[in-house]
């Protein structure tokens, strides 16, 4: 778990994630932009705590069993000239307060029902030291409970969990909370994060998950100093593909995930990938229908173009999103990065002309790998990405086909760094020094780093690591 000081440095450095969410709402304007570190960590924390406490004070304390829902932050920017349909056929989004009725929750014998005070004790009173991070739903705290019960236990014993609290003024709300329970509470697979249980007490809404010690894929790809080794990247891609394949083809009732991205792929201690955050998930159409019509929701840069333009949602929309994430894994670049030169800001459009070029594909690969990747594996992975990103949704493969294509890749050992043909493929700079992965290297530069998969740092499993107010409740 990231330390408190490290967590706040991450927030100060990153601020609003560039290009990932499309247009951010005005309430985010106080968050620092990338690279702006003019404020001290103490002043940043003070401002954040004060603003969160102020927002909570606005909530009517007389509310009972009502979730205050803010405008969702996951609304996709509508393409100019192609407005999304206004008709909504039951998408999982929030636009107004929704009364909670017990009938809205699907019964699941797999879930534990927690008391608020038990979770308060399990997280050590939601103290800052237990904070893992914050997302659109609210703040997430580390806690410890009984292995097979709901009572809190001493830190370091029992079952380690991640407790997600609903922020009444947050960017996701009641419908997302329900969707998370109704989907994850009834879906069990090694590639899905396990939902342990939930708390629904007065106006408190909390979710309890298994703890994922390695954090998110996003954190490892874009925020860590050491790069993920090639074999680990392929292992993660395969695991995430298995999760989508289960949702689309193996679940009793097929599910469209709708929010597949690197921040929603969490990693356990062995770097096994698991999908999290089912707040935007929807039931897939039955055999009589070709698609689900819904308002466009998701994250800019990952959504399939036909979905953004028409609002028609299918399992092939998830396949496109997988192709984007696979590109991020291969290149080490974000799906949208406004800090890059024109022509390179949109990852898909930048790589599309080169995906099937066997003589130039290596230029797309993350230069931090320094040639430590399988040549055959990289060629196959780029081919799979190209198929998933096909503009014709019907031509995209099923996720089960993607799984079969990726299965051999983590174990291939034909590393480019030991290939003489790879060395001759590298472009030569003006000073006569060959480059790797499209970047220049020094003649007397340091030797290649060891990319062991066993010594990478752990990370918080949630997007933002910020100090946060405690959920409302009486002191014990």
Swiss-Prot record:
Signal peptide: none annotated. The keyword Transcription regulation does not apply. This is Serine/threonine-protein kinase PBL36. GO terms for cellular component: plasma membrane. The modification Phosphoserine is found at residues 263, 293. It is a lipid-anchor. It comes from Arabidopsis thaliana. Disulfide bonds: none annotated. Gene3D superfamilies: Phosphorylase Kinase, domain 1, Transferase(Phosphotransferase) domain 1. It catalyses: L-seryl-[protein] + ATP = O-phospho-L-seryl-[protein] + ADP + H(+); L-threonyl-[protein] + ATP = O-phospho-L-threonyl-[protein] + ADP + H(+).
